[in-house]
Regions:
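Membrane-anchoring hydrophobic helices of lipid-metabolizing enzymes
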Residues: 1-82, 92-94, 101-105
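A structural motif
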Residues: 153-164
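A short secondary-structure junction signal
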Residues: 92-94, 119-121, 162, 168-173, ...
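Surface-exposed cleft-lining segments at the edges of enzyme active sites
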Residues: 128-139, 167-175
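Short amphipathic alpha-helices and their capping/turn segments at secondary-structure boundaries
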Residues: 143-153
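Hydrophobic/aromatic ligand-binding patch that stacks against planar heteroaromatic rings
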Residues: 98, 149, 186-187
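A cross-family acyltransferase "interaction/gating" segment
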Residues: 156, 168-243
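Catalytic core of membrane glycerolipid acyltransferases/transacylases, capturing the structured
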Residues: 35, 80-137
Length: 243
């Protein structure tokens, strides 16, 4: 089995020094734990669609529906799932797990670095949020086109409209998404897709918000995503389905 590099360090977004900082902090704060869990998971061959329910069990995550009615996910037809993005990795895993219980024809638009897991490649439509050069802009345009085609083929698509993890204005405030992008609304209009809005309760820890909001340091913020994921093992997560 090839060694998997659990890291948010991206050659397209970060220079060598930034990648070194991110990888060092990740290694110190949780990377080895996640790699160990993945290694134990990947020993046995499994169906790709089972990855989502399996990983929720391995991470010992409990998912609680706070809605006054059962979660309703159409089993067929174009569907866009939109949600706030308070955690980074865990909320994406939860959404994919929930959708996978009803259908296998779904994809998630998410950070391109998450393709480091081979099990995710089939499901990910990669986005480079730096959008800072011709190559990354081209990739993002291709991803947007693929997303539209996928919906036109009656697939399901998971999107975090903010395009970034929720942050708090100061260390005592609740975390909020950045302003939502117009792209999901355009997709809904163009593809006539059903929409499933989800709201997650919670936020990341003090260190993340210190780096993201107080210091406004993107490199240090990225370095905490693995740590935040490790911290969230064996915990309960609540969501509400909006009408």
């Amino acid at each position: 089995m090839n060694k998997i590099d659990f890291s948010y360090a991206s050659k397209s977004e970060h220079n060598l020094a930034q990648r070194l900082i991110i990888k060092t902090i990740e290694t110190i704060t949780g990377k080895k734990k996640l790699e160990k869990l993945y290694k134990s998971y990947s020993i046995n061959t499994r169906k790709p669609i089972d990855f989502w329910s399996d990983i929720i069990k391995i991470l010992d995550i409990k998912i609680l529906n706070n809605s006054s009615y059962p979660l309703t996910i159409p089993s067929e037809g174009p569907l866009i799932v939109i949600a706030n993005h308070p955690f980074g990795i865990i909320d994406g895993l939860i959404l994919c797990s929930l959708v996978s219980e009803r259908r296998s024809d779904f994809k998630i638009m998410t950070h391109e670095t998450l393709k480091f897991l081979p099990e995710l490649e089939k499901f990910i439509l990669p986005v480079d949020f730096s959008n800072k050069n011709r190559e990354t802009k081209k990739q993002n345009i291709e991803t947007a086109t693929k997303a539209k085609h996928h919906l036109n083929d009656n697939g399901a698509l998971i999107i975090f409209p903010s395009g970034s993890v929720s942050t708090a204005k100061d260390l005592k405030s609740n975390a909020q998404d950045d302003e939502w992008k117009l792209f999901p609304a355009k997709l809904i209009h163009q593809t006539k897709s059903d929409v499933l809005p989800i709201f997650f309760d919670g936020k990341n820890g003090l260190l993340f918000h210190l780096f993201a909001s107080k210091l406004k340091n993107q490199t240090l913020k990225y370095s905490t995503y693995i740590h935040e994921t490790k911290k969230k093992l064996a915990k309960k997560y609540q969501f509400t389905q909006a009408k």
